[in-house]
């Protein structure tokens, strides 16, 4: 579970649940193929689409630091109709 860090619960991600789309923060070095394979094997679902983006850097003071720290990457996955991830299911 090094690839996927944790699920994201924001207003946008909750709205996307209605369209069978789930949001996760993942390791910044992971690629889409690794993430897709991990999610399909771990949750036993079929991923039909995936979008990823890097989170913007945090502002603040940086003393003698060149560049900026790489934060995690966020992915939005779309599952086929009928599949769901139990972490997000309503009870």
Curated annotation (Swiss-Prot):
State whether keyword Nucleus applies. Answer: no
Classification via InterPro entries: Nucleotide-bd_a/b_plait_sf, Ribosomal_uL23-like, Ribosomal_uL23/eL15/eS24_sf
- UniProt GO MF annotations: rRNA binding; structural constituent of ribosome
Q: Which domain of life is it from?
A: Eukaryota
Biological process per Gene Ontology, one example term: translation
| Annotated GO CC locations | chloroplast; ribonucleoprotein complex; ribosome
Pfam family name, one: Ribosomal_L23
UniProt entry tagged with the keyword RNA-binding? yes
- Give the UniProt subcellular location, in the record's own words: Plastid, Chloroplast
Q: Cross-referenced SUPFAM superfamilies, in alphabetical order?
A: Ribosomal proteins S24e, L23 and L15e
Q: Which UniProt keywords apply?
A: Chloroplast, Plastid, Ribonucleoprotein, Ribosomal protein, RNA-binding, rRNA-binding
Q: What does this protein do?
A: Binds to 23S rRNA.
Instruction: Share what the entry says about its subunit structure, partners included.
Output: Part of the 50S ribosomal subunit.
The entry's family comment says: Belongs to the universal ribosomal protein uL23 family.
| Name by which UniProt lists this protein | Large ribosomal subunit protein uL23c
């Amino acid at each position: 579970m090094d690839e996927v860090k944790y699920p994201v619960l924001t207003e946008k991600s909750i709205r996307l649940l209605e369209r069978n789309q789930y949001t996760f923060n993942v390791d910044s070095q992971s690629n889409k193929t690794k993430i897709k394979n991990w999610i399909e094997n771990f949750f036993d679902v079929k991923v039909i689409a995936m979008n990823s983006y890097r989170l913007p850097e945090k502002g603040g003071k940086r003393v003698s630091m060149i560049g900026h720290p790489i934060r995690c990457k966020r992915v939005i996955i779309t599952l086929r109709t009928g599949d769901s991830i139990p972490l997000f299911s309503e009870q």
